[in-house]
Amino acid sequence: MQPTPTQRPEAIVHDEKAQLDFARDMSYGDYLHLDELLGAQHPLSPEHNEMLFIVQHQTSELWMKLMLHELRAAIAAIQQDRLQPAFKMLARVSKILEQLVSAWDVLATMTPPEYSALRPYLAHSSGFQSYQYRQIEYLLGNKNAAMLQPHAHRADLLAQVRAAFEAPSLYDEALRFLARSGLAVPAGALQRDWTQPYRADDQVEQAWLTVYRQSERYWNQYQLGEKLTDLEDAFRLWRFRHVTTVERIIGFKRGTGGTSGVTYLRKMLEVVLFPEIWKLRTDL
């Protein structure tokens, strides 16, 4: 529709009741603290592509902040036998992981020569040093005491990461819920050293098999198993895209943090977070 000679184009573009004066009101930018957020990118090199590298990792950290928020809330809900809210939170975590998976496509537009030009400016900084990522790994049950060390230089960060390291994981709380539901979960899975990686247990698998064979009776437990499956499936996809993106950009060079790079990341693909939920699919 074209404006008539007596109409101002602005009257068509703007809703007449839209708030346009923010001299004394909170604006969109004020609410989101956009000055601070958009002022947090400080390239160290003259390379055009460093902005992509920074924004990729900063946005990933924002999504991980939301993941931690949802994971902690889901764990608390499971502890209180509030399964429906927990399902919503776990589904959201899986969707966040989808966002993180697709983000690798953007970073993959960086070619090997482009990354090589900015790599010297990164020093020994590396993604495995992310204190939010480490907390996510710990909350999902991948406990490794050595990964506390990169945060030892900051007592405040170390305290956060250590708290996740020492707490029961999401899967630990899922097994506790099964036990409270009357299922035969062995004491060794319910009372153990939470700082140690979880080891698969045949009796735990039998408990999950009961859930899956009698899903109508154990509907919440069954749904919990499937939400955990969705989450680990999404996490595996994220790990895989991480490996392929890194290999595409740096090949088999060592990582900036001193790891073996792609070789190290491929080993992470072998980590199984919720082993019995996957094994039961063969045994059903």
Swiss-Prot record:
Its EC number is 1.13.11.11. Disulfide bonds: none annotated. SUPFAM superfamilies: Indolic compounds 2,3-dioxygenase-like. Heme binds at H242. Keywords: Dioxygenase, Heme, Iron, Metal-binding, Oxidoreductase, Tryptophan catabolism. Pathway: Amino-acid degradation; L-tryptophan degradation via kynurenine pathway; L-kynurenine from L-tryptophan: step 1/2. It comes from the Bacteria. It is an enzyme of class 1 (oxidoreductase). Its cofactor is heme. One of its GO terms (biological process) is L-tryptophan catabolic process to acetyl-CoA. InterPro entries: Trp/Indoleamine_2_3_dOase-like, Trp_2-3-dOase_bac, Trp_2_3_dOase. Pfam families: Trp_dioxygenase. NCBIfam families: trp_2_3_diox. Homotetramer. Belongs to the tryptophan 2,3-dioxygenase family. This is Tryptophan 2,3-dioxygenase. It comes from Bordetella pertussis (strain Tohama I / ATCC BAA-589 / NCTC 13251).
